[in-house]
Amino acid sequence: MSVQSNSNSSGSLDGAPSCSQFSTGSPTPGSVSPLDIFAPRRHKEGMDELHSLDPRRQELLEARFIGAVSGNTGGSTGSASGGPKGLNNNECSSHSFGSLGSSSDKESETPEKKHFESSRGRKRKVDNQSESSQGKSSGRGPKISDYFDFQGGNGSSPVRGLPSVLRSPQNSHSAPGAIVRQNSSSPTSLCFMDHTMNLKQLSSRSVQTDLTLLKLAALESNKNLDLEKKEGRIDDLLRANCDLRRQIDEQQKLLERFKERLNKCTTMSKKLLIEKSTQEKQSCREKSMQDRLRLGHFTTVRHGASYSEQWTDGYAFQNLVKQQEWINQQREEIERQRKLLAKRKPSSTPSSQSPTPNESKQRKTKAVNGADNDPFLKPSLPTLLTVAEYHEQEEIFKLRLGHLKKEEAEIQAELERLERVRNLHIRELKRINNEDSSQFKDHPTLNERYLLLHLLGRGGFSEVYKAFDLFEQRYAAVKIHQLNKNWREEKKENYHKHACREYRIHKQLDHPRIVKLYDYFSLDTDTFCTVLEFCEGNDLDFYLKQHKLMSEKEARSIVMQIVNALRYLNEIKPSIIHYDLKPGNILLVDGTACGEIKITDFGLSKIMDDDSYGVDGMDLTSQGAGTYWYLPPECFVVGKEPPKISNKVDVWSVGVIFFQCLYGRKPFGHNQSQQDILQENTILKATEVQFPAKPVASNEAKAFIRRCLAYRKEDRSDVHQLGSDSYLLPHMRRSNSSGNLQATPASPAPSGIISY
């Protein structure tokens, strides 16, 4: 009964570790044993449990500890035998440390459990006795040898070589801490010590190498050398870094000084440019005031309820008019005297010879006495002159008429010169008036870059200023587009879209015969600007108004440059049709006809992309736009579908410009307005071009113009054919005798001279 009570009390210790916790493999270096983790707690619990056992239980445990030495040899044989004991030991050894403190349903059987279950079976039913595991035990109490039946294993494994007291269920629940603490007096502790030493030896052997002390010393010396090199390299890099930082600081300071100096230079440049522009404006106004008296000025004249400006000539024109009137009076007087002289012209026949002195006396007497009874007094007949006297007077009159004619030619030349100067004067007056009314007249700096100097011209919705680019240090032409504030938003958007389209087309162009577009920016919602290349000279239209016409060589040079630019526009992808070629859009760089030209104003340009351009050309969506004198007949055709155009539109414009340069007039609709041209279908009727007799032009030039002004666009040359035309080839020379073009070997021309 005491055994059963002890087994019940020992069986209540469910938190003690089982024997499977000691069945792990070989410990690795640095691993911590579960016995070491739970040793203090188990020792305390084991000591309390030992004191609570009865004396008989203590005697049994002491006898078990004493027989542990002999149990080590017997354990190997016991583990080799099969049966339920070996199975239970394997089950116990298969548990992991995760089952610590848990009561498993596969708990190992002990003699106490057998005895307890058999005793319980007697009280209940006989049928329950067959359910006990591994046979029935007798009614007597457990023997000491029953506690050693569960010592299995061959003794070679550290886990299986553990003493039986550790594998016993009762002792595993009773005093695990006491077993661990008995390391010096117990043989089991000695076994643990030997096993631990073996593990340490194995772990130490696994890290041993074949390195000798010399090799270690060499490696250490090499490592030290490498370390010294690295430290030296680090020091060098640190010094270089410090030097670079110092240089960066110096360069930064130098850059700041340069920036400050640049700002000072920019400020001074702005100041000097403004001073120069102010002086130029002042001198222009003074000169304009002086020319007002000499050349004329505008006066306001009232016509009913309206006012209009009327031009009044200055004293220079008035003097020329007076001189012209005097010359006319002198010419009339000479003509009158010549008529009188003709009456006194002597007769060429002998009968009409001069009378004798007696006959002349008789005639005088008759005249005084009133002979022939004539009641009226008759004037005396003019005295006939001799032949010598007549020729002498005739020669004098001819010389006087010739002198008057020469003076009249001089006056006419002076009048033409004054008219050209007057045109400049009128243009300057309008420019000054527009500049004074402009909001950009006080030299503002647009976009913090472009300093406006003075107004160049003004159009319908734009102003063009000469400006100075402070960043690039160059002159530029700034075109300021100002929208009408009273416009609808839709109209403003269309205008802005049109300007952006012109900017996108013009921005991608890069050719020496095309004005470059530098920049584009906005000032406000109703104002935006485009920055263009600045040219000192005027346009071709102003030149023709001043000089009427030019020589064929000069006109041919201009046409060659225009065709060169058109070839570039048709070689890029997508190709571009200018559509608005006219003398006003051709700038003379030097202001003369013998220099370079540049094409500008791509506002009406057409892009010939793959979507809109076909075999017959592209649709003209902006019919009615452009300058009518320079557009071909296909642009005026009205039908259900819009007309098709191609680069032959620009070829027609080239022919009109060439004709105007040679003859000083337009070939079609010269004195007509655009409205008259549209109403009278002037261009649609222009089937053939007519050349004036003067000035004289070569047949090759006329043939070239005919090829450009062919009425049907199918018969007209395109831009590529025009570029390879024989008339424009530079190696052709004109023969002085025949007037035809002859091919001559090109001789090396001196530098700076263009040979045509």
Curated annotation (Swiss-Prot):
Species classification: Eukaryota, Metazoa, Chordata, Craniata, Vertebrata
Reported cofactor(s): Mg(2+)
Active-site feature positions: 580
A Pfam family per the record: Pkinase
Native source organism of the sequence: Danio rerio (Zebrafish)
Listed PANTHER family: MIXED LINEAGE PROTEIN KINASE, SERINE_THREONINE-PROTEIN KINASE TOUSLED-LIKE 1-B
Record's protein name: Serine/threonine-protein kinase tousled-like 1-B
Keyword Metal-binding: no
GO CC entries: nucleus
Family per record: Belongs to the protein kinase superfamily. Ser/Thr protein kinase family.
Protein location: Nucleus
